[in-house]
Amino acid sequence: MENRKTFSWLKEQMIRSISVSIMIYVITRTSISNAYPIFAQQGYENPREATGRIVCANCHLANKPVDIEVPQAVLPDTVFEAVLRIPYDMQLKQVLANGKKGGLNVGAVLILPEGFELAPPDRISPELKEKIGNLSFQSYRPNKKNILVIGPVPGKKYSEIVFPILSPDPATKKDVHFLKYPIYVGGNRGRGQIYPDGSKSNNTVYNATSTGIVKKILRKEKGGYEISIVDASDGRQVIDIIPPGPELLVSEGESIKLDQPLTSNPNVGGFGQGDAEIVLQDPLRVQGLLFFFASVILAQVFLVLKKKQFEKVQLYEMNF
């Protein structure tokens, strides 16, 4: 009887442990996969600082190019494409959080003018849906529908990101006017070098925190190193911790200086930002312009006809 109770108790404990492990895995995986947007959204009320710098550059230190393409002008209540290109060498591999090498992810933030927002699914054409693929965009804040974030997503598949945008209608939104507006964009490829709390990731170079001699280099079981540096002047010992990923550049017995690189820089990615302009065009102005062009063309036609008629009259008079 006691054996049965013991077995039942053990079985119950095992089920609880497995359930807790699964929950932790799901929560952890979700937080990692959503890391890029969450880092920016949690740390900053607005992703664009007063200086014009997009805050993603605070964590992604390398500067890389991006390209944004939008129509020159759009009509009110119209769906259009904003195409962001994040170019990089597809053969490159980045250092992952566990120190291993893997493909680069990309992410982006698109800052639209007030009133512009992500197009609803029922307004997106089949052709545009095909260009978008399986991307899932989200607003930076519930009250900031004009700021969109995406990522991290696989760079090999989404180095070109198509945003479906709905233009506002000044007839229904009184704070929107027919004007030229700026659009700002930021795009990254690869992991960042600094976390939002200021700590370093393993995707950056590690420097010596003291001048001295490398007394000992201990290779850790799960990867990475502990480097013991002894100051020759006072015998003070400092231990620098190197996470898995960066390659070591120093050896035991070597003299080093403060801030001297202890590792290579494994970062192959970077962040870039750009801007574009778009005109919210008044349909009446377009109609007026078309009417003007039509008037000019008709005037030219009538002028040609009148000239030919005059030439015929002259020719007729000359025959008499």
UniProtKB/Swiss-Prot annotation:
Cofactor note: Binds 1 heme group covalently.
HAMAP family: Cytb6_f_cytF (MF_00610)
Subcellular location: Plastid, Chloroplast thylakoid membrane
One Pfam assignment: Apocytochr_F_C
Protein source organism: Sorghum bicolor (Sorghum)
Record bears the keyword Transmembrane helix: yes
Membrane topology: Single-pass membrane protein
Family recorded in the similarity comment: Belongs to the cytochrome f family.
Coiled-coil features, chain-numbered ranges: none
Signal peptide start and end residues: 1-35
Superkingdom to which the source organism belongs: Eukaryota
Transmembrane segments annotated in the record for this chain: 286-306
Name of the protein this chain belongs to: Cytochrome f
Function: Component of the cytochrome b6-f complex, which mediates electron transfer between photosystem II (PSII) and photosystem I (PSI), cyclic electron flow around PSI, and state transitions.
GO cellular component: chloroplast thylakoid membrane
